[in-house]
């Protein structure tokens, strides 16, 4: 069985975000084009489909970490605040975006609420496992080193 940990993260996130966009599991709100993703950012993201990429990245983080709450998940997407010549100061990402995506992923059946935070549901696990299988098959066609994972 191929685990998400053995698949290159950029390929997995792009594949899963394409699946989420294609199956319309997440409703794209109106504010997506205008919102910043955190206090440390000056402008909104340049990608048009960044909300799907963020959702796929959140699913991958939940797969690897087991469970995460809104606060810890938003700190994963933080950065450093531009304070001029003053020292570095860490800032977390937008909690409202994280909360919105958790609600959307819960309504799609990919994430479930637990006592310790949010975790992947069996549907979410199977989505990521199937995606990693497909990616490993594609990589095995290009490079024979990946055939041992099939």
UniProtKB/Swiss-Prot annotation:
The keyword RNA-binding does not apply. GO terms for cellular component: cytosolic small ribosomal subunit. GO terms for biological process: ribosomal small subunit assembly; translation. GO terms for molecular function: RNA binding; structural constituent of ribosome. InterPro entries: Ribosomal_eS19 (IPR001266), Ribosomal_eS19_archaeal (IPR027548), WH-like_DNA-bd_sf (IPR036388), WH_DNA-bd_sf (IPR036390). Keywords: Ribonucleoprotein, Ribosomal protein. The keyword Transmembrane does not apply. Part of the 30S ribosomal subunit. May be involved in maturation of the 30S ribosomal subunit. PANTHER family: 40S RIBOSOMAL PROTEIN S19. Belongs to the eukaryotic ribosomal protein eS19 family. This is Small ribosomal subunit protein eS19.
